[in-house]
Design a protein with these regions (language model features):
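Structured, active/binding-site neighborhoods that engage oxygen-rich ligands
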Residues: 1-366
Length: 366
């Protein structure tokens, strides 16, 4: 099945829009948001220097995808490669370097490190930088800590966009989504939502008449089958997402009240909040963004995930132009999305040579 270019672009751009919009009000109370922006809350970007600024949520997803493309390129061009999680780990460590004013190594491998728009110091949880400077990082079996914040959940978006249906196993890629979060977050309430989000994004990338609610139900069933016995916390993750789906069916409920009920603080709650925002918007991206960021929780995280899900369904062409025209890294994200759709065009022994791909994924953009 051919990949839908506009869905891939929409996923990355939508994620960045939600990230940038939520950044302004992240972790502020709803009372503070209303005090600053009026009774209806934040209704669009609060621009800084004319640009909508992204944070580590978009950066981490992009670097994760960069690392995976680096890995598959080495595999095809050199005939051998490490497990995929090693490339995610390497990319996340390089991203962490970009967030510090010191210590950048002379040799780097992610081409995004050469792009200043993707390296601005906007890490939403700075303790991650300390975690990423240590060895070893976490696994599903041995957590590096017990953190459950949503700081690295968007790594799962990069994993989902990397998936190749013809050559990869769905369960393995969902597990990779969890593993990518577990590198820095040891709580199952952080990394299990990474697996579920990976599956939801994958289902949304497929052009289909199936409703979003049905896609989420199918993802929940697959998630329960894969992780339900291994992790007792899987039931709680499922329960939170189902609570969001139940709240979405209530037409008498104010969206702010629903989001406050869901709290939107840890990884599982943030995913639930994003699901609620997407299910109640009736396909209106602007409406979903307003719901996703106006609450007392992690607005940038919820906005990022809601934007990724809805952007994958609607496609880049359906995203409002006023969101994209001042979005700082939009052209870079389009370039990365196109690379994810294309995949490595070269193989070992082939006469085909792509200079741009070689520069980005074998020589770190240099």
């Amino acid at each position: 099945m051919a990949k839908n270019l506009w869905a891939y672009r929409g996923c990355l751009l939508g994620m960045a829009v939600g990230d940038a919009m939520g950044y302004t009000v992240d972790s502020k109370s709803m009372d503070q948001i209303r005090e600053n922006y009026g009774p209806n809350g934040l209704l669009g970007y609060d621009l800084m220097n004319g640009f909508a600024e992204i944070t580590s949520y978009t950066q981490l997803a992009a670097f994760t995808a960069n690392g995976l493309l680096l890995g598959i390129t080495r595999g095809q061009m050199q005939g051998h490669m490490a497990p995929l999680i090693r490339y995610v780990e390497h990319a996340q460590r390089e991203w962490a370097v970009s967030q510090r004013p010191w210590g950048r190594p002379g040799i780097t491998h992610c081409w995004l490190l050469q792009e200043k728009e993707m390296c601005r110091r906007r890490c939403m949880d700075t303790w991650m930088l300390d975690t990423l400077s240590r060895t070893p990082l976490g696994t599903l079996e041995e957590g590096v800590n017990n953190y459950m914040t949503p700081a690295s959940i968007t790594a799962a978006v990069g994993v989902a966009l990397f998936y190749d249906r013809e050559n990869m196993d769905l369960r393995e890629i969902c597990r990779l989504g969890a593993e990518s979060v577990a590198l820095t977050h040891g709580s199952p309430y952080a990394f299990l939502p990474g697996a579920l989000l990976t599956d939801i994004i994958l289902r949304c990338l497929i052009k289909s008449m199936v409703s979003l609610e049905k896609r989420i139900e199918d993802a929940l069933a697959a998630f329960a089958s894969q992780f339900g016995r291994e992790f007792a916390q899987a039931d709680k993750v499922i329960s939170l997402v189902r609570q969001a789906m139940t709240l979405a069916r209530r037409e008498d409920l104010d969206p702010v009240d629903a989001m406050e009920t869901l709290r939107c603080e840890n990884g599982a709650e943030v995913l639930a909040g994003a699901v609620y925002a997407c299910l109640t918007c009736d396909g209106d991206f602007d409406s979903a963004m307003i719901t996703a960021v106006n609450h007392s929780g992690r607005s940038s995280a919820v906005g990022s995930i809601a934007g990724a899900i809805l952007g994958a369904i609607l496609g880049a062409k359906a995203l409002p132009e006023f969101y994209l025209e001042c979005l700082e890294p939009s052209m870079l994200l389009i370039e990365l999305a196109d690379d994810l759709v294309q995949g490595c065009p070269m193989e070992m022994g082939s006469k085909l040579f792509d200079d741009d791909w070689d520069r980005k994924y074998l020589h770190g953009g240099k």
